[in-house]
Amino acid sequence: MGAFENKVAIITGAGDGIGRAEALALAAQGAAVVVNDIAPAAADSVAAEIVAAGGRAVVHCGDVSDWKTTADLVAHALDEFGWLDIVVTNAGIVRRSPIARVTERDLDQQFAVLFKGTFGLIRHAAAYWQGEHEAGHHGHRTIVATSSSAGVPGGVQEFSVYGAMKSGIAALTLGAALEFRSFGVTVNAILPHAATRMDAAAKGLPAPGPFSAGDASPENPFHVANVVSYLASEQASWLSGQVFEVTGTEVRRWLPWSPGASVSNGAGPWTIDALDGAMATSIYGTLPGGRVIPLAG
């Protein structure tokens, strides 16, 4: 018996790349999958792959940036399968641009798809699960959100808007984990590294070919899907509010923002000169010759 027998999963952006791999991986372990994508042909293709392999899948086409679409997505899962256990928020968009050239449209689109789309689906799923819990219908329910190393730790040139949205998703993961523990829902996030058409297009690279589960390439999205499968499983029910970077077969835990060195000026106010000296000697330290240690990265 697979890890997800009698489980129902929603995966957004599942028509290609990481989302496709996640849908196929969960379905291979018995999950009934709602394959969401904005491109109907792509969603149909992945659902057909699942069904051809003996699994269960239905298609939901829609743009997650629309609040009603994310509500309809949860309703569609309930209408088709009767309940919902797993949500994987993978749908994404990226626009490469220096900050000084970002347009309002670029900003609005990335916010709507990346952050609002993630938040909307999490919100609607949580409302359903909270109601189920209050009605006495308990079970293992889980959310896996997709952040990015452009957001955690951040600082990728020309991807600042994308990184800011992805950083917000990591923060949302921590907050949601605290809120949802009262009704038995775990929430974790991943920072995936894999070859995808979206990433290649943003960087001006050729589109990668389709991957299979057995491909050992470190860029294979199925490496990410394997980690998502674990986080969605009951074996990971003790984990919540965590962020994991996935690079090939390497999994790295990322910690939230943590305080560094501090310095106080006692009762007196800071001056520019005093704070400059404190920064060099107490906050960052100095190297021989007085050169300030640069920021990491």
Language model regions located:
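A short, exposed helix-loop element centered on a Lys and neighboring polar residues
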Residues: 122-123, 174
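A glycine-rich helix->loop->beta "capping" turn
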Residues: 5, 53-56, 76-87, 95, ...
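The beta1-alpha1 cofactor-binding region of Rossmann-like NAD(H)/NADP(H)-dependent oxidoreductases
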Residues: 40-41, 61-72, 104
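Canonical Rossmann dinucleotide-binding motif of NAD(H)/NADP(H)-dependent dehydrogenases/reductases
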Residues: 2-34
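Catalytic loop of short-chain dehydrogenase/reductase
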Residues: 134-168, 173-174, 178-182, 191-217, ...
